[in-house]
Amino acid sequence: MSRAKGAKAEEIGALFLQDLGYKIIDRNFYAPFGEIDIIAQKGGVLHFVEVKSGANFEPIYNITPLKLSRIIKSAQYYLKQKKITPPFCVDALILRGGEVEFIENITL
């Protein structure tokens, strides 16, 4: 996915989350292990959200065990940098053909 397409998908994802009552805390957070697309909060829980989009395939398949491991390490790095210890989870926002699917607390 090009940077422009990725940025557009992340913008759509952030607006989608806001419509669901999430507060966007940060976007495109870079850690030594990788990037977190969106960091949002709802009900005292931090959500580290990976955004994937695609028209000709299932974007969820791009979240591999290695990618999930890097997201978790990046989330832990974020929490350590901010010196906070809230409950958190890793979510996926899938954009496909104009539709948005939100998958909370992904595991592989």
Swiss-Prot record:
GO terms for molecular function: nucleic acid binding. Signal peptide: none annotated. Transmembrane segments: none annotated. InterPro entries: Restrct_endonuc-II-like (IPR011335), tRNA_endonuc-like_dom_sf (IPR011856), UPF0102_YraN-like (IPR003509). NCBIfam families: PRK12497.2-4. Belongs to the UPF0102 family. PANTHER family: UPF0102 PROTEIN YRAN. HAMAP family: UPF0102 (MF_00048). This is UPF0102 protein WS0451. It comes from Wolinella succinogenes (strain ATCC 29543 / DSM 1740 / CCUG 13145 / JCM 31913 / LMG 7466 / NCTC 11488 / FDC 602W).
